[in-house]
Amino acid sequence: MLEIKNLHAEVDGVEILKGVDLKINPGEVHAIMGPNGSGKSTLANVVMGNPVYEISKGNIIFEGEDITEEPVDNRAKLGMFLAFQYPESIPGVTIVNMLKTALTNIEDIEYTTVELRLKVAESMEQLGLSADFADRYLNEGFSGGERKRNEILQLAVLDPKLAILDETDSGLDVDGLRVVGEGVSKLKTDDKGYLVVTHYQR
């Protein structure tokens, strides 16, 4: 599914990734653990195509296709997803409208708002989110736990082939960890891959 070969990447002329090799097959969950500053989030961003980082050497192969030079939106259309460590707030854009736009771009299907609400209702219930959660502006005024639940909600609705979770477990209390963990477990299937980034040694 995903194969990273001798990946070197830098930002502002400073090399951060120095020859990373990784292979993820369908149905597998891989964890990248390490202290802050060790390059875990850099790897997640480089795999997803963040233009801030420059790949100086190596290749990223997804489902047999070399995507090393592909932009972020193309990777999303191929079925890749990144749950951010620090999700941004977007005032004026509701969660349901963001999901509607994302699905339209990825699947080339024009969902109505009603169709989208039906699609997200079950996932919201599983994550312990209230019915009006989808009408809130994206991450505006959200607690840390709500931001992480929103990332998992996006994961559930967008249903990618490969999900990269960048420290989705950080900053959560015990209940938040349980809800997010259960949400990810329910989404895991034999045809999907997961790359989990964490600084927790567990």
Sequence positions of predicted segments:
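The feature captures the beta-strand-to-loop junction immediately N-terminal to the Walker
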Residues: 33-35
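Helical segment within the ABC ATPase nucleotide-binding domain
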Residues: 177-190
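ABC ATPase C-loop
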Residues: 155-156
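H-loop/switch region of ABC-family ATPase nucleotide-binding domains
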Residues: 197-199
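Q-loop/switch helix immediately C-terminal to the Walker
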Residues: 86, 92-106, 119
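ABC ATPase NBD Q-loop/coupling interface
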Residues: 59-75, 139
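Walker B catalytic motif
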Residues: 167-168
